[in-house]
């Protein structure tokens, strides 16, 4: 951590020197963002919004989750190599809203633990990523408690010809990309093609990704010389499970490899300047992905599982978007989006030395529609909208004896009868441009969320009920002010509320997140609410920028997994194991607070130093259980984290040396009943770490780009908080992009 402090001190000194020498500062060009769904200038938004537009950062990562990690702006948890669960301001999974091209990715089965859904969006075809920090329920609805991660894929590009012909010519261009990394034997091939004239544009993209077993770093802390070592794995020989010795290659995280295929097709039709029709088709499919953390789990020195893997993760999406501009009447612009998604996921498990293999399958059909209208006034903007989403969930399961091939009944993960969930809302957001460089933001949203779940087979779990129904209505809003000075000084402060209704995963799940620990349904859950205050201040000039964000969130009715009784019993027999009973429950109160400091400084021609640092703290208390107001750690709260980078280059070439770092997460700060996964940490918690990395890109020709990177130069062995797999060791990466 001394290295981190030294870099930050030097960074601060550089800012002071530059501030003294910069006597004639000028404000840099403002950034266009889509946090309000329509294009707007970032200076008109009170909340902190980070826009990631660097194509090198976006497209030269192993997957979309790694974009967030590499940026240093978001903490990302991993249970396996084929995953990545963003944490925004202490909120994760179903409390962070994922969007792709303006369409909700969060479904009724988004769990409260850790997710990997973000990797189903291909980073090779991403155009930009926007991160909205803090409750964003006014415009985005339920789930946007910690914030919103907006993923925008590349748009088809029309070809505007200067030729005076009646029939416009067609133009074809595209990109071929290859990327290889030795740390995981990564092989990725990508192609995208754009075919267009002045009215029609067709974009197709295909990416094939293959990852072998990830090699972790070899340089371990002296206090934890064996941390993360893969000492064994389970193989099946002669119809028997046997433990294989892996001591010769302890840094190879055997079983962590996977493959993935991504396809995107877009069709744009623009008959005139005021009308656009866009058809958006996306498909993502993976191989089986081992749950690496569960495969390393032991009990009394014996592996708990012989098999534990996710089946192919499927995301199919079809969306149609209509955009109208320069409308007659009060509203000048309109967008309408109708979309359908088909999602599939599954979990397959078999305990060590057992012939019984359990299969659990989930399918979700998700239908959505939203309409947004925008009015431009001389000194104000009014954005109103309506949206509706409907989820239909089908959960099935069976057991299979691999020796006799005889099937048996087992518990489904979710309710096995007709199960559906719907979200409906109407909202308005107003922006008022006041005198003296002040901007006022205000908004309101009326939410209604309904859920109906039915349990057909209640015998296996002795269900005390046969259905679970909810109908929740909530009003959320935001109010804030922004000051944008002519000298580049920007100050914002605001308050907002967030809302999340319990979903199918919260209300109906039966599953063991670890051995001897089973989560059961709780039909009496209530919605979660957050009330957030935020203060941001920044200074931007031609030579430097520096800013800080402070936030404090009151979390009411927070859902926390805690001890529970099922049919008046605190332990039950689940999958042959006597297990403690837990369930999601609304706690009395919780708070999450923290800050971010970030900035960049031009230290020489074409040379910039940039840094970001985030600190988050969270706890909850429940007088009913403790008899006193005793604060306990809230789960999902990451340690301090950030990034420092020195970059030099121009359009022809560039190179960057950078560090990504995490602070300590002491075991006393873990939530031992939640999703912090203390069993995959050291006895003292998750140690702090700092990695040193290098990235360079060279463009010898206009249509050719070559890349060379070294991740984790020191080959450090480290692991992100709450993760069950260690990060990659020293990783050499080469890439090549050919444009045509």
Please place each PLM-identified region on the residue numbering.
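Outer membrane beta-barrel strand-and-loop segments of large Gram-negative receptors
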Residues: 362, 366-372, 423-425, 520-526, ...
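Short acidic/polar hinge/loop motifs at secondary-structure boundaries
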Residues: 105-135, 139
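Signature of Gram-negative outer-membrane beta-barrel scaffolds
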Residues: 383-486, 512, 582, 624-629
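Transmembrane beta-barrel wall of Gram-negative outer-membrane proteins
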Residues: 184-210, 220-288, 314-316, 433-434, ...
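Flexible loop and strand-edge segments within Gram-negative outer membrane beta-barrel domains
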Residues: 254-260, 270-331, 342-364, 413, ...
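Gram-negative outer-membrane beta-barrel transporters
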Residues: 435-436, 440, 448-449, 552-554, ...
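Surface-exposed extracellular loop regions of Gram-negative outer-membrane beta-barrel proteins
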Residues: 342-346, 394, 399-406, 450-461, ...
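N-terminal periplasmic "start-of-domain" segments of outer-membrane beta-barrel proteins
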Residues: 30-58, 85
């Amino acid at each position: 951590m001394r290295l981190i402090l030294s870099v930050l001190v030097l960074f601060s000194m550089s800012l002071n020197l530059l501030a003294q020498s910069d006597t004639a500062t000028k404000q840099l060009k403002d950034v266009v963002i889509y946090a309000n769904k329509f294009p707007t200038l970032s200076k008109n938004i009170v909340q902190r919004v980070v826009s990631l537009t660097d194509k090198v950062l976006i497209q030269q990562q192993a997957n979309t989750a790694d974009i967030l990690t590499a940026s240093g702006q978001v903490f990302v948890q991993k249970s396996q190599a084929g995953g990545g669960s963003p944490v925004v301001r202490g909120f994760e999974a179903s409390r962070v809203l994922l969007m792709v091209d303006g369409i909700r990715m969060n479904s009724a089965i988004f769990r409260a633990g850790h997710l990997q859904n973000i990797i189903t969006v291909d980073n090779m075809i991403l155009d930009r990523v926007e991160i909205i920090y803090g409750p964003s329920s006014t415009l985005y609805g339920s789930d946007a408690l910690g914030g919103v991660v907006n993923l925008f894929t590349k748009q088809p590009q029309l070809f505007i010809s200067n030729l005076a012909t009646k029939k416009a010519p067609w133009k074809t261009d595209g990109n071929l990309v290859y990327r290889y990394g030795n740390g995981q034997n990564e092989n990725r091939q990508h192609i995208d093609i754009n075919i267009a004239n002045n009215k029609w544009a067709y974009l197709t993209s295909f990416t094939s990704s293959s990852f072998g077993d990830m090699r972790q770093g070899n340089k371990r802390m002296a206090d934890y010389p064996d941390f993360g070592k893969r000492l064994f794995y389970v193989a099946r020989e002669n119809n028997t499970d046997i433990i294989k010795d892996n001591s010769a290659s302890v840094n190879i995280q055997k079983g962590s490899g996977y493959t993935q295929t991504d396809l995107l097709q877009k069709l744009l039709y623009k008959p005139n300047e005021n009308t656009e029709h866009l058809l958006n088709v996306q498909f993502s499919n993976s191989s089986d992905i081992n749950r690496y953390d569960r495969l390393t789990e032991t009990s009394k020195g014996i592996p708990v599982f012989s098999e534990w893997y996710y089946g192919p993760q499927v995301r199919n999406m079809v969306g149609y978007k209509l955009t109208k501009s320069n409308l007659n009447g009060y509203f000048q612009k309109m967008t309408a989006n109708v979309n359908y998604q088909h999602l599939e996921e599954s979990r397959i498990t078999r305990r060590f030395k057992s012939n019984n293999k359990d299969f659990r399958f989930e399918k979700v059909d998700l239908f959505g529609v939203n309409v947004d209208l925008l009015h431009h006034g001389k000194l104000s903007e009014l954005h109103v909208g309506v949206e509706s989403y409907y989820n239909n969930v089908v959960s099935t399961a069976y057991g299979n004896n691999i020796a006799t091939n005889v099937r048996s009944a087992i518990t489904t993960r979710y309710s096995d009868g007709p199960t559906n969930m719907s979200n409906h809302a109407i909202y308005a957001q107003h922006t008022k441009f006041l005198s003296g460089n002040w901007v006022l933001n205000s908004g309101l949203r009326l939410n209604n969320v309904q859920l109906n779940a039915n349990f057909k087979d209640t015998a296996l779990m002795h269900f005390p009920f046969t259905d679970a129904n909810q109908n929740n209505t909530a009003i959320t809003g935001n109010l804030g002010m922004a000051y944008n000075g002519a000298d580049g000084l920007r100050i914002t402060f605001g308050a907002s509320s967030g809302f999340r209704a319990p979903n199918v995963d919260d209300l109906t799940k039966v599953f063991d997140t670890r051995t001897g620990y089973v989560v059961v349904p709780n039909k009496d859950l209530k919605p979660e609410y957050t009330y957030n205050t935020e203060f941001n201040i920044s200074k931007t000039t031609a030579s430097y920028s520096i800013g800080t964000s402070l936030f404090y969130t009151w979390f009411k009715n927070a859902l926390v997994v805690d001890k529970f009784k099922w049919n008046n019993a605190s332990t039950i027999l689940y999958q042959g194991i006597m297990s403690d009973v837990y369930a999601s429950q609304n706690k009395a109160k919780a708070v999450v607070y923290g800050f971010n400091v970030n900035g960049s400084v031009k230290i020489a021609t074409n040379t910039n130093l940039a840094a970001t640092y985030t600190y988050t703290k969270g706890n909850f208390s429940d007088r009913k259980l403790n008899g006193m107001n005793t604060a306990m750690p809230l789960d999902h709260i990451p340690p301090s984290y950030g990034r420092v980078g020195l970059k030099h280059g121009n359009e022809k070439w560039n190179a960057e040396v950078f560090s990504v770092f995490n602070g300590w997460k002491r075991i006393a700060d873990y939530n031992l009943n939640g999703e912090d996964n203390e069993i995959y940490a050291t006895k003292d918690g998750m140690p702090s770490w700092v990695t040193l990395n290098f990235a360079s890109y060279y463009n010898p020709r206009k249509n050719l780009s070559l890349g060379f990177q070294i991740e984790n130069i020191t080959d450090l062995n480290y692991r992100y908080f709450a993760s069950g797999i260690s990060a990659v060791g020293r990783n050499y990466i080469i890439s090549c992009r050919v444009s045509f």
